[in-house]
Amino acid sequence: SRKVRSINYFSDKLELWHPDKKFNSVLVLGEQGIGDEIMYSSLISDLIDTKIKVGLFMDRRLKGLLSRSLGNHEFIDNQEEAIRKGYSSYIPLASLCKFFRNSKDDFNKNSFYFRSNKSILKKLITNYKSQKPRIGISWHTESLSHGTQRNIKLSKLIHLLRNENIDFINLQYGDHGTEINRLSKKLKRDIFLNDSIDNKNDIDGLCAKISACDVVIS
């Protein structure tokens, strides 16, 4: 995969970052999928706290979200650019766990959280109009290794979705139009509030949608 090739590329050209070594900069390599990069992002804030220059070689869809949440750290577009920029070390993102997550207290000490785009959030809330409680729902992952444990048919949530005192927001990525339309016909109304956000590619928009929710079911 691209992520494995990147790790192999940088391991031949840069030293592996370690807190006991005096590096002046480090390139953080995203690994696995975008969901894992989001899950491990709080580790980057711990790395930044060590006062080292941090560059990010991660999924470009996260640039806006991470720039707002972590500060404007450099996003690197390709391997050669990282070498030209003179980074002195590299580390795969999840490998930061062994330095910054060794006890429950380490999790409690970290105060990192994602910041949604306020402009997008304001437009969404204006567009949604209703004052009903808003519940965001996602129900499917494309993960081959964990999909069977984490997926559910949308129809299994019909007891919840039939409640007309709640507004539902679609947080699901991918093409699930047929499934949504089938259930909408059964309930004789649109299940989800309308918006134009691409949940797979517009991560800033998706983050704003989550922020607009009172509750999220995932």
Sequence positions of predicted segments:
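Catalytic machinery of carbohydrate-active enzymes
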Residues: 1-218
